[in-house]
């Protein structure tokens, strides 16, 4: 697996600058750090889906980084952005939410998974944008942003997921039949 997709299109409610571009250590921003980690792990194809303030992301374009513009970022959610890369995905890949801070070890572990899907999760953060996880026998049975729908709370998604191509293609098929532009990719993960 040598491909990663980073979703960065949305406009944050409380910031004029996209979260992935805010400095995290005085000089680097989150996208700088994420790209560095992916390169250290020999990812050769990185697709950055941009929308709000898309021109601010142009500096990241490189031979190994392709920018895809979601012109409808204001009226679509994460699945709308993810669907834009359907013609560029030819195998399994890492899906990363651009405003997510994570350890290199997480990428190493997900990259080492030989096949299938793998969702990373942690304890509840209280960020207000959680996607809660319920599992049964080691398998995810429910993903929801509504905590009231979870009987056996396991945690929340981190925002870094290994997706197999078969699942991704099923998600795309469901998206193309959907009438809801605000659909988040997390919901389709358990629907397919």
Which sequence ranges carry the predicted segments?
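Short glycine-enriched, charge-decorated loop/helix-capping segments at active-site entrances
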Residues: 18-24, 177
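Conserved N-terminal catalytic core of the sugar/cofactor nucleotidyltransferase
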Residues: 2-6, 28-93
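Catalytic core and acceptor-binding pocket of nucleotide-sugar-dependent glycosyltransferases
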Residues: 179-192
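N-terminal nucleotide-binding beta1-loop-alpha1 segment
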Residues: 1-17
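Conserved core of the sugar-phosphate nucleotidyltransferase
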Residues: 103-179
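Conserved beta-loop-beta/alpha segment of the NTase-like Rossmann-fold superfamily
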Residues: 59-136
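Cofactor-binding loop segments of dinucleotide-utilizing enzymes, especially the Rossmann-like FAD-
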Residues: 7-10, 51, 98, 122
